[in-house]
Curated annotation (Swiss-Prot):
Tissue expression as described in the entry: Highly expressed in spleen and peripheral blood leukocytes that contain mostly T- and B-lymphocytes. Expressed specifically in resting T- and B-lymphocytes and expression significantly decreases during B- or T-lymphocyte activation. Expressed at lower levels in thymus, ovary, colon and small intestine.
Similarity comment: Belongs to the TRAFAC class TrmE-Era-EngA-EngB-Septin-like GTPase superfamily. AIG1/Toc34/Toc159-like paraseptin GTPase family. IAN subfamily.
Protein name as it appears in the record: GTPase IMAP family member 4
Keywords, ordered alphabetically: Coiled coil, Cytoplasm, GTP-binding, Nucleotide-binding, Phosphoprotein
GO CC list: cytosol; intracellular membrane-bounded organelle
Native source organism of the sequence: Homo sapiens (Human)
Length: 329
């Protein structure tokens, strides 16, 4: 990320910044995927193809249908696929402040970092605006994110009988330049496909993503901003878990007081034992309920009002520190 909020990037060049494979904990059973590209490139439809069902709203429109970063998930081979669809924040006319806010939202939704960054480009006429948006994306993520990036060509169905490799050999120079950057890390999709064709291309893409993950030693893309955001999320999660612990102890004390008062008033030993068992059952139910809440504390934190502002504040503080570092160099 750049040092200043409002012109933020994923490409900090500060001394000591950490890039490349990051720890997958606490989400080591997840495969986190981010879709980026210009408005109308087919990001939402690609997300639906990856997840195997229609969960993102997609369609043909001059303006972005997706208004802010959205996260959806599904299961695949005992792995949770987490896909984040981004709006047209990388379009050249979008203000940097708006881009920055959605980048922070993307960080929140994919922390501690994505395993794959999918650059979505439609096949066909590659306009100057599309080229500029692509350049903005590549610059924003930086050279060191390239090993996590995959090029996705949408509208494969527009090729008709033309072979993809034949098309790419005759493609415009800008597309050829992209191919030089991504090498064999590319895939073409027909997002209108159904049945066997849909499953086959889904398996091909997920296989490519798995290959990228292996090549990056099972790690995820990270940088100082992701690390700072993850620290804030974990801090808030621990605070939430402590709150749940206090609530549980308070509720258990209330239950004990209620039942012990009733037990004291009983003279029948059998009735006393019956009430004790009822109390123990009630306590066990509360412990089970709060155990689930503890496990879901992170999700609760990520979805609560105000967390985006907390992350923004944390990253702005980090940005201030980075600015000081630049000034001292």
């Amino acid at each position: 990320m750049a040092a200043q909020y409002g012109s933020m990037s994923f490409n900090p060049s500060t001394p000591g910044a950490s890039y490349g494979p990051g720890r997958q904990e606490p989400r080591n059973s997840q495969l986190r995927i981010v879709l980026v590209g210009k408005t109308g490139a087919g990001k939402s439809a690609t997300g639906n193809s990856i997840l195997g069902r229609k969960v993102f709203h997609s369609g043909t429109a001059a303006k972005s249908i997706t208004k802010k970063c959205e996260k959806r998930s599904s299961s695949w081979k005992e792995t949770e696929l987490v896909v984040v669809d981004t709006p047209g924040i990388f379009d050249t006319e979008v203000p940097n402040a708006e881009t920055s806010k959605e980048i922070i939202r993307c960080i929140l939704l994919t922390s501690p970092g994505p395993h794959a960054l999918l650059l979505v480009v439609p096949l066909g006429r590659y306009t100057e605006e599309e080229h500029k948006a692509t350049e903005k994306i590549l610059k924003m993520f930086g050279e060191r994110a390239r090993s996590f990036m995959i090029l996705i060509f949408t509208r494969k169905d527009d090729l008709g009988d033309t072979n993809l490799h034949d098309y790419l050999r005759e493609a415009p120079e800008d597309i050829q330049d992209l191919m030089d950057i991504f090498g064999d890390r590319y895939c073409a999709l027909n997002n209108k496909a159904t049945g066997a064709e849909q499953e086959a291309q889904r398996a091909q893409l997920l296989g490519l993503i798995q290959r990228v993950v292996r090549e990056n030693k099972e790690g995820c893309y990270t940088n100082r901003m992701y690390q700072r955001a993850e620290e804030e999320i974990q801090k808030q999660t621990q605070a939430m878990q402590e709150l749940h612990r206090v609530e549980l102890e308070r509720e258990k004390a209330r239950i004990r007081e209620e039942y012990e008062e009733k037990i004291r008033k009983l003279e029948d030993k059998v009735e006393q034992e019956k009430r004790k068992k009822q109390m123990e059952k009630k306590l066990a139910e509360q412990e089970a309920h709060y155990a689930v809440r503890q496990q879901r504390a992170r999700t609760e934190v990520e979805s609560k009002d105000g967390i985006l502002e907390l992350i923004m504040t944390a990253l702005q503080i980090a940005s201030f520190i980075l600015l000081r570092l630049f000034a001292e160099d």
